[in-house]
């Protein structure tokens, strides 16, 4: 861990972790201060990565496809060499990011649900080289850097990649796969934010650096996405080698973390889907526990209440929460020039909310600012090299949209 990251982590750890979460009014904003244009159409897209030094981007589709798209013309071509994925309601080909040194290395990072030798599928983090020759493109030398060896059934993979501010390590969100209890088990990678080297090893300076997990863990499979998961019978899984989960873990107690982004000061923010209500915006601190499934600002899908965060001051509460749910899908912290008034704002894609949500930050606090109705489920939000804000809709005929400043009326 670099001095800058260690310094930021120390300051954040000392900053009021026990503050109450904010749940202010969340009414839709009137009018849109941006124009919306369509760039291209995709089938079940999940994520997008702009490629430095070009007008090209990679778009993943959950069924196992990657497209190379020109964001200027909207033209696209398939990318070959994609690893095999297991497609389910929330599983398949998921996140994609260009490596920090992409211009020189041509490396990209992927997350996906891979076939498990035990049962179902497990989350995998892979790295590959993007090769372009003539009119084609393919992934070469695909290498799995990290995986959940236990596998199993269930959705909620998380699977979001964020490179550290110094570009020497990465953070990976790992959902709890609808099993509840692993989020509080230090020997299971589910329900965690992991901090890894660029080669997928435990990053130096992690809160539990050097610690090993239990060689045998209990897997709730099939999962129970209700309170019943806490008492469900499970199968025993023996780790195929040293269990490095504690050494990999940055934070714990997460449900389905779908957004990870650093602000300009090096703070790591996360958006997380709650159960029925209780979607969260969290400031991620090293070694902290965010409480799931023991506390939440929402309720279980079967209506069984969950104790609120205020009942457990030993857990870190969210900075913001949404009840009813908006189903946050992704997080962008804007740093472009096209919308100077929004520099430093957070933008959250909302699935069930069918909206683009804006939040503002002040140090380690956050405030709800705007919520624009988009009329469709927003799967992903990001910033383009032109400073435009780009959105991917969810679904089998989903548009890639570009947001630019609205022209003054009259």
In which residue ranges do the predicted regions lie?
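Positively charged n-region of N-terminal signal peptides that target proteins for export
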Residues: 1-4
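Bacterial N-terminal signal peptides
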Residues: 6-16
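Acidic, Gly/Ser/Thr-rich repeat motifs that build Ca2+-stabilized beta-propeller blades
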Residues: 17-181, 259-261, 267-274, 324-364, ...
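Beta-propeller domain segments
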Residues: 25-29, 91-93, 101-103, 124, ...
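Amphipathic coiled-coil/heptad-repeat helices and related helical stalk/stem segments
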Residues: 41, 154, 253-254, 374
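Short, solvent-exposed aromatic-acidic interface loops
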Residues: 114, 144-150, 209-216, 298, ...
């Amino acid at each position: 861990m670099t001095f800058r990251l260690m310094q930021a982590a120390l300051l954040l750890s000392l900053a009021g972790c026990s503050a109450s979460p904010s749940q202010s009014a969340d009414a839709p904003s009137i009018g849109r201060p941006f124009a919306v244009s369509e760039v291209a159409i995709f089938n079940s897209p999940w994520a997008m990565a702009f490629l430095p030094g070009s007008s090209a981007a990679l778009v993943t589709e959950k069924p196992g496809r990657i497209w190379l798209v020109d964001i200027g013309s909207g033209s696209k071509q398939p990318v070959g060499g994609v690893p095999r994925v297991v497609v389910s309601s929330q599983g398949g080909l998921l996140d994609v990011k260009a490596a920090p040194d992409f211009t020189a290395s041509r490396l990209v990072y992927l997350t996906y649900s891979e076939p498990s030798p035990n049962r179902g599928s497990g989350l995998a983090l892979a790295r590959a080289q993007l090769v372009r020759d003539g009119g084609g493109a393919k992934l070469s030398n695909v290498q799995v850097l990290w995986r959940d060896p236990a596998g199993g059934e269930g959705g909620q993979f998380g699977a979001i990649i964020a490179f550290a501010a110094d570009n020497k390590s990465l953070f990976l969100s790992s959902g709890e796969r609808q099993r509840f209890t692993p989020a509080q088990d230090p020997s299971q990678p589910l329900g965690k934010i992991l901090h890894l080297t660029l080669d997928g090893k435990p990053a130096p300076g992690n809160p539990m650096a050097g610690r090993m997990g239990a060689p045998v863990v209990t897997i709730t499979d099939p999962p129970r996405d209700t309170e019943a998961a806490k008492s469900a019978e499970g199968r025993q899984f023996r780790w195929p080698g040293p269990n490095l989960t504690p050494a990999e873990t940055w934070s714990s107690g997460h449900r389905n973390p779908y957004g990870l982004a650093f602000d300009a000061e090096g703070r790591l923010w996360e958006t997380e889907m709650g159960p029925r209500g209780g979607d969260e915006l969290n400031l991620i601190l090293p070694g902290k526990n965010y409480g799931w499934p023991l506390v939440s600002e929402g309720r279980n899908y079967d209506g069984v209440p969950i104790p609120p965060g205020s009942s457990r001051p030993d857990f870190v509460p969210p900075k913001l929460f949404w009840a009813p749910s908006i189903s946050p899908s992704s997080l962008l912290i804007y740093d472009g020039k096209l919308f100077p008034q929004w520099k430093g704002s957070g933008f959250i894609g909302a699935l069930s909310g069918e909206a683009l949500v804006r939040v503002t930050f002040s140090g380690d606090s956050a405030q709800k600012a705007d919520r624009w109705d988009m009329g469709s489920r927003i799967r992903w939000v990001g910033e383009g090299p032109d400073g435009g804000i780009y959105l991917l809709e969810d679904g089998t005929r989903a548009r890639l949209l570009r947001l630019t400043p609205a022209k003054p009326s009259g």
